[in-house]
């Protein structure tokens, strides 16, 4: 076992040969490499599978022995400073290694078919393998310097993958937005690392925690304030990377990348890096209570904000992105409360559930592209979907499992972890608990809204004119159910919500239905440049994905069904013996310090019943608003009579419109940043440009013009006669000597002698000039 741990440093570098060999192949043998590009998926999956097997072995050793291994190499720069590099294998690293490798393998397997027709297939697999390498290096780092290096590599890979289709302006803008937003957090992270090194003299985690703890125990107020500041800066890095408020604005725009990378970013890599950093540094944060309170506060704000922003999104991937933001808020809330186990448990269950949902959405998008073309604005638009359960039944089943899991319906994965966080929140703060439980209902609502809009009812794409012709340029399809002008300020009615997926015979609220022209599909050009389609087929309806994509969905369904078993407390002899508790024992748990590690199943069932009831309420409301069953009620005019007699109709419409505007416009946070930050920086740049051009350049050009005009003026004093120059020279010398004699008392005869010689030189020069 010692031998295995000693050489576990190679784990991050096992997937690295893939991008290196792809790059060398494109440089040395470009034609052969491109012609056999599908071959490169095999080594990518094989090498990552080797890492997964090694990670599973290390985790088994961790469970059996609770063993922590750290190996360090010291690089001495001088007598006063040295850098130490190494690797750390502990329970947290083992969990993250398995999570990254399992999700990464399934994403690679899925991507082989999903990206098969894209010209950037090789580039995608090179980026993806390097992404996995960076994340593996991050979770096995033994000090803050290594974490920062791999942290930046993860950010670079996300920039490359979000902007993978960089020829699309919106994708190029999205990757720049993600890069700039994360630079804010990364700058704070770097300052925090340097500050802690200045006060402790070490980057190693163990030394860092021990020294800081000793400094705080000495009741040194200066050290406490400085450690609090450094902890805040470190937390800022996690806020940006995990898309927490207020640095969350990059996450929905990151959906412009290919769907497989969206699944990897939102499940196991980039957003998980911030949660991992807080979990790794939790012993430091526990020493500073203000930071723990801040972590929980940011977490609960993000929980509520992400859920409300997901209520009215029309893009299926953006809806899932805001869902990820909200669930990451739950994890951050748990860490802020000190519930270390619950946070990691939810990180695991959410990773597989969200990977299932994203890969399922990729299968939906893949099926819609055969109808609407390769345009994300159309293939990802839930307004154009509906009724897909008849065309993609396997994808529908997988997506339903992921949806129910995220809603917190037992016995699926997220139910167990989210319920544990909700129970701990009641012990921490009743206000936070109320918000967290309410958000659980919002989660169930917007997730079933996505499911019903996508799979229920009838395929709306056949009833709407989406071709971009003049007849549809003024109107767009609203998620609330009818065609309205694109201006968000226009009012929406509640009845429009109820007819979202109704067919034409029963829904009399859609009065203007434009049939799809037969030549529309021929006029739609691919949005993304592709190579060729060997067996191109034309489909009039969506079709199920290929078996390679469905295999990844099937495996993720199994994970979603059974992965929670590692954290379910099976009671034996008065103590819980679940795998996760054994792996994390001893772990930080501030809310259960005096617990005997015994599960009260009566209390558990009571709390679980409450959380499940909230989730079922959210599902019921979503079904009430989006299920086509209400077309029968419309035929009896029941809804119309109720709606007309309602005295609060105007007020309800205003509330509904406000919620819609808030959600669809992303809480106006992006607009605020655009006006205040972007506008302010542009104004400052214009002011700086004006100052540089008018003031700085004006001064320099003024000196030049002054010299020019002075020279032009002086040139008229010279007539070209040497005697005149000598006479003028003598006069200036006389004036100088006269002034000098006045101040230094120079003898008068010396001055006269100099004037006589100067006058003789002038006469001689004049005569010489006349002779010539």
Curated annotation (Swiss-Prot):
Q: Which InterPro entries match?
A: NADH_UbQ_OxRdtase_chlpt_su5_C, NADHpl_OxRdtase_5_subgr, ND/Mrp_TM, NU5C-like, Proton_antipo_N
Q: Which key words tag this protein in UniProt?
A: Chloroplast, Membrane, NAD, NADP, Plastid, Plastoquinone, Quinone, Thylakoid, Translocase, Transmembrane, Transmembrane helix, Transport
Q: Where are the transmembrane segments?
A: 9-29, 40-60, 89-109, 125-145, 147-167, 185-205, 220-240, 259-279, 290-312, 328-348, 355-375, 397-417, 426-446, 550-570, 604-624, 731-751
Record EC number: 7.1.1.-
- Membrane topology classification: Multi-pass membrane protein
Function of this protein?
Answer: NDH shuttles electrons from NAD(P)H:plastoquinone, via FMN and iron-sulfur (Fe-S) centers, to quinones in the photosynthetic chain and possibly in a chloroplast respiratory chain. The immediate electron acceptor for the enzyme in this species is believed to be plastoquinone. Couples the redox reaction to proton translocation, and thus conserves the redox energy in a proton gradient.
- Record-given protein name: NAD(P)H-quinone oxidoreductase subunit 5, chloroplastic
* Gene name of the record: ndhF
């Amino acid at each position: 076992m010692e031998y295995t741990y000693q050489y576990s440093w190679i784990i991050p570098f096992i997937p690295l040969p893939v991008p290196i060999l792809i790059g060398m192949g494109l440089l040395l043998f470009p034609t052969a490499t491109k012609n056999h590009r599908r071959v490169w998926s095999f080594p990518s999956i094989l090498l990552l599978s080797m890492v997964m097997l090694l990670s599973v072995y290390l985790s088994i050793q961790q469970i059996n022995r609770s063993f922590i291994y750290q190996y360090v190499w010291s690089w001495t720069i001088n007598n006063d400073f040295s850098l130490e590099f190494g690797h750390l294998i502990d329970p947290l690293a083992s969990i993250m290694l398995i999570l990254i490798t399992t999700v990464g393998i399934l994403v690679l397997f899925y991507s082989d078919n999903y990206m098969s027709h894209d010209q950037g297939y090789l580039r995608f697999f090179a980026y993806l393998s390097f992404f996995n390498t960076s994340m593996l290096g991050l979770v096995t780092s033994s000090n803050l310097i290594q974490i920062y290096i791999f942290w930046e590599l993860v950010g670079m890979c996300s920039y490359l993958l979000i902007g993978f289709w960089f020829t699309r302006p919106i994708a190029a803008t999205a990757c720049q937005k993600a890069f700039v937003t994360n630079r804010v957090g990364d700058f704070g992270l770097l300052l925090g690392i340097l500050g802690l090194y200045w006060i402790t003299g070490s980057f190693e985690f163990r030394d860092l925690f021990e020294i800081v703890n000793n400094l705080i125990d000495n009741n040194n107020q200066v050290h406490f304030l400085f450690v609090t500041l450094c902890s805040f800066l470190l937390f800022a890095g996690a806020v940006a990377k995990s898309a927490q408020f207020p640095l969350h604005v990059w996450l929905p725009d990151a959906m412009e990348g290919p769907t497989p990378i969206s699944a990897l970013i939102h499940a196991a890599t980039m957003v998980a890096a911030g949660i991992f950093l807080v979990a790794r540094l939790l012993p430091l944060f526990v020493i500073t209570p203000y930071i723990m309170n801040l972590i929980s506060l940011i977490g609960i704000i993000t929980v509520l904000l992400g859920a409300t922003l997901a209520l009215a999104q029309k893009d299926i991937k953006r809806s899932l992105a805001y869902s990820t933001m909200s669930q990451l808020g739950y994890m951050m809330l748990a860490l802020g409360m000190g519930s270390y186990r619950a946070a990691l448990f939810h990180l695991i269950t959410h990773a597989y559930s969200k990977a299932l949902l994203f890969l399922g959405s990729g299968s939906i998008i893949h099926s819609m592209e055969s109808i609407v073309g390769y345009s994300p604005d159309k293939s990802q638009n839930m307004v154009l979907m509906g009724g897909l359960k008849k065309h993609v039944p396997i994808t529908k089943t997988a997506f339903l499992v992921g949806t129910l899991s995220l809603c917190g319906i037992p016995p699926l994965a997220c139910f167990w972890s989210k319920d544990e966080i909700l129970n701990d929140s009641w012990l921490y703060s009743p206000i936070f608990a109320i918000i967290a439980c309410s958000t659980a209902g919002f989660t169930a609502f917007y997730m079933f809204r996505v499911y019903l809009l996508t799979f229920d009812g009838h395929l709306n794409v056949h009833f709407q004119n989406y071709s971009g012709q003049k007849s549809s340029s003024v109107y767009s399809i609203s998620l609330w159910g009818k065609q309205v002008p694109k201006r968000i300020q226009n009012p929406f009615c509640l009845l429009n919500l109820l007819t979202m997926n109704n067919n034409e015979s029963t829904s009399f609220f859609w009065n203007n239905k434009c049939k799809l022209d037969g030549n529309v599909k021929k006029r739609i050009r691919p949005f993304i440049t592709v190579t060729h389609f060997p067996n191109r087929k034309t489909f009039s309806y969506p079709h199920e994905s290929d078996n390679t994509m469905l295999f990844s969905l099937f495996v993720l369904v199994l994970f979603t069904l059974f992965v929670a078993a590692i954290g379910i407390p099976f009671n034996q002899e008065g103590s819980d013996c679940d795998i996760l508790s054994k792996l994390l024992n001893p772990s930080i748990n501030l809310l259960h310090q005096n617990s005997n590690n015994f599960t009260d199943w009566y209390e558990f069932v009571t709390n679980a019943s409450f959380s499940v009831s909230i989730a079922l309420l959210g599902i019921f409301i979503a079904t009430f608003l989006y299920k086509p069953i209400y077309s029968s009620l419309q035929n009896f005019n029941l809804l119309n009579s109720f709606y007309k007699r309602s005295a609060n109709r105007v007020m309800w419409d205003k509330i509904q419109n406000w919620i819609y505007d808030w959600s669809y416009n992303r809480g106006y946070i992006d607009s605020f940043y655009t006006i205040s930050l972007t506008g302010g920086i542009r104004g400052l740049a214009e002011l700086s440009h004006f100052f540089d051009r008018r003031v700085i350049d004006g001064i320099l050009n003024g000196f030049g013009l002054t010299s020019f005009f002075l020279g032009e003026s002086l040139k008229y004093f010279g007539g070209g006669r040497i005697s005149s120059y000598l006479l003028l020279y003598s006069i200036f010398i006389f004036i100088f000597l006269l002034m000098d004699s006045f101040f230094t008392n120079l003898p008068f005869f010396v001055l006269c002698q100099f004037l006589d010689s100067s006058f003789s030189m002038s006469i001689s020069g004049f005569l010489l000039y006349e002779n010539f």
